[in-house]
Amino acid sequence: MKNNERKQGRGKKVFKEKEGNPGLQGETEKELDHKGAGIIEDQKRAEMICTWMDGTGPEADIVINSRMQLARNIKGIPFPCLATEEQREKVFSLLEKIFKEQQERFSAYSLINLSGLSPIKRQVLTEKQLISLLMVREPEYSALLLSPDEVMGILVNEEDHLLLQALLPGLQLEKAWEAVSCHDDYLEEVIDYAFCEELGYLTACPTKVGTGLRASALLHLPALVITGQINRILSAVGQVGLAVEGIYGEGSQMTGRLFQISNQVTLGQTEEEIWRNLYGVINKLINQERAAREQLLNAGREKLADRAGRAYGILKHARLLGFQEAMQLISDVRLGVEMGMVDNIPLKTLNELLVLIRSGCLQNLKEKTLSHYERDLERSVQIQKCLP
């Protein structure tokens, strides 16, 4: 059965020493070394930035990114969690061969063998939201096929054999769905998917059986938190079949007033029904957050401006910053930016900081393992380099 037909069916569903005065030359070389190190660090920092951080897209002041994930498995091979090492290798080799043969579609893509990366490099990919924590812990015969702009990714041997993922800035659920659906249609021409007429697409996680679709959006909801409305509202979100999690999804800690909202089940719904339902709930959350911001303004504009200004002052001048404190301060500054109280700080910069201040990225920048104290020190350095 063709993919399009199935989607309408059960899925309803990064000097050589010169001659001359040794003293002067040594000083010059030191300056060059320092400059060179700075260039390398800038290059590394740039490598850790991707499209979803650019601060554009609809409702980008509240919705940081939208993501679609489509789980698929190969018929006749056990799910990765049940597969032997030989079976995982078979899946890896098969998909690697397919990706290399399909030059028309994947010629510009990069195939990243995760077992060939250091733990820190894998952690960076997680912090960029490109792979899961599972793939950091279990990288053997796992891979990431990544588009040049890092919008589209295909994860190999994660929870399922294939996880197609699109990640876009702002509220762009439909566009993200179109991206994964297009790749899914293309791959089904060359892969025999595990599919059941009664249930739909078969997946390792029971809640994904049917369409295999997980739709989500990452929201910044500071006003709802500050006004004390967040628990009531998130409880209501849970009652309509949606999950509320931290920035990295299931099991991740909620911090910086960031909340990831996603669907929990797919069976009995079409893909469009899933993402449109999520879209409707997110729009309600956006309206409630805007109303709460007006409430804060009415209670005292100067209080809000002072809050953002104090947060900016600490971020710009503190010598040591813990992760949780930094996230909270970035949230305060972001609220000030979003409400027109703080000038000259693009949302793009604040989005990038959400990733750059994390332990993996900090250690990647310094090319070594850092202690807790060293991370706090480097975190303040990086924040002050980024903020105007």
Residue spans of the language-model regions?
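Conserved phosphate/anionic-ligand binding catalytic regions in large, soluble enzymes, centered on
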Residues: 200-217
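Long, Pro/Ser/Thr-rich low-complexity/intrinsically disordered regulatory tracts in eukaryotic proteins
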Residues: 2-17, 23-198, 213, 227, ...
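Structural signature of FAD isoalloxazine-binding scaffolds in flavoprotein oxidoreductases
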Residues: 220-223, 229
